[in-house]
Swiss-Prot record:
InterPro entries: Integrase-like_N, TACO1_YebC-like_2nd/3rd_dom, TACO1_YebC_N, Transcrip_reg_TACO1-like, Transcrip_reg_TACO1-like_dom3, YebC-like. The keyword Hydrolase does not apply. Gene3D superfamilies: 1.10.10.200, 3.30.70.980. Residues 1-21 are annotated as: Disordered. Pfam families: TACO1_YebC_N (PF20772), Transcrip_reg (PF01709). It comes from Azoarcus sp. (strain BH72). Belongs to the TACO1 family. It is found in: Cytoplasm. This is Probable transcriptional regulatory protein azo0574.
Amino acid sequence: MAGHSKWANIQHRKGRQDAKRGKVFTKLIKEVTVAAKMGGGDPNANPRLRLAIDKAKAESMPKDNIENAIKRGTGQLEGVTYEEARYEGYGIAGAAVMVDCLTDNKTRTVADVRHAFSKYGGNMGTDGCVAFQFKHCGQLMFAPGTDEDALMEAALEAGAEDVVANDDGSIEVITGPWEFTTVKETLEKAGFTAEFGEVTMKAQNETELSGDDAARMQKLLDALESLDDVQEVYTSAVLDE
């Protein structure tokens, strides 16, 4: 068993993501564009693009928007050229923070990220200072009350890497990053629908924060996530609010 408040944290994070839907389309279009640029415009041959398209469809993005983003990535349409950038640092109580960006101006982006770290009690580190603390993987979260044995059997048969039962009754299925969509769809066909799922950088060791520390950490995470160039923010912090 693991994770004293995993379900609450996942629900809280999901709520914060829902509240930011105004920025979601912009971020998804960037990801589709860059995925197509890096690996080509065929989602069947480009797992990253397939995942980006699935996320866009889940947010009800119009088909034309998706297709135009792919064409900008492959050069069929003109558009802004985005570069990937990752910044690492520390939050409250030394919690690891990793910030993934897509930007057309790295000088602006690094200044914005550094300012957010400094303003809200964290500090930006050097490349690689916390990356080793995270694993690139898919994560599917199932609600408390799900049949653990049946889910475990179905998940491992579908190609999942691990199944973790948390203290709060929720169950986590871990997949490889590019196997995420296949495992998710296979489990849905078997009758198991995740409450939350994403490809993420999962912290290997968690830093539990409560009270003022949790509130301060939340402000730092919100500040980073609000930046236009930021796509994803990952942290080892578990907030007990």
